[in-house]
Amino acid sequence: MSSLKPLVAELPVFDRKFWDGTFRCTQIGSGAIGGKASGLVFIKDLLAAQIDRPSFPDVEINVPTMAVIATDCFDQFVAQNRLAELRFEEMTDDRIAHAFQKGDLPVELLGDLRALVVQVKTPLAIRSSSLLEDALEHPFAGVYATKMIPNNQPDPDSRFRRLAEAIKFVYASTYFREARDYIRTTGTKPGEEKMAVIIQEIVGHRRGDRFYPDISGVARSYNFYAFEPARPEDGVVTLALGSVSYTHLTLPTILRV
């Protein structure tokens, strides 16, 4: 298991009115928040501290509002539904996902999720944030699942069901074949990996039956494919109208709502 300490160990406790509260990043449960959530909060604080405020008084750096379901909820879910042994079974990803969908989420977590969907009607990204994700020595980028949900159904029960299904799918991806194969290559014991889940608002605007941001992109501090006169240490930015992914540009990428 990684010996590195997380960049951010924990977040303020989730408040069931958090979407309009003081804290944009909160935590459900008492376990770890995982590498991705820790990195998001760390880089937000780092960049905010380096802004030249006098020159850019109106610039605000933040991460989209998010609640992180800590790893203790994953442990409870796996234990109470007797799913731990699936990591050793030769099952297809579809069968593993089906087994996880049949499981019941912890009662306290269900209460928090219901409170969330009553308030929030914007599209959401349900993102993995495992203990090993975004580690420097063995980055797990792209190994686990992310689900994007419209979250615009008029019935709160429907929004709740879609959210619960998405969380269970991200949990299930911990046991998918690609994840298990990758874990073996790192020398990590299967039981040492645990999953936190980020529930995060998707930034953008509704345009007709689509929802997307004005622009989006990815910035890297080092460019491995720099052409002169650019230098590798100059970095590189991929920018697009709408949404941009690591593999392709779209004009725009969609979330139908």
Task: Enumerate the predicted regions with their spans.
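A broadly conserved detector of short glycine/acidic/proline-rich loop/turn motifs that flank catalytic sites
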Residues: 130, 201-203, 242-245
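A conserved ligand/cofactor-binding region detector
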Residues: 199, 204-206, 212-214
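Extended C-terminal regions of large enzymes
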Residues: 212-245
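Non-catalytic terminal extensions of PLP-dependent enzymes
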Residues: 102-103, 205-206, 217, 221
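N-terminal beta-alpha lobe that positions the nucleotide/phosphoryl donor
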Residues: 1-198, 207
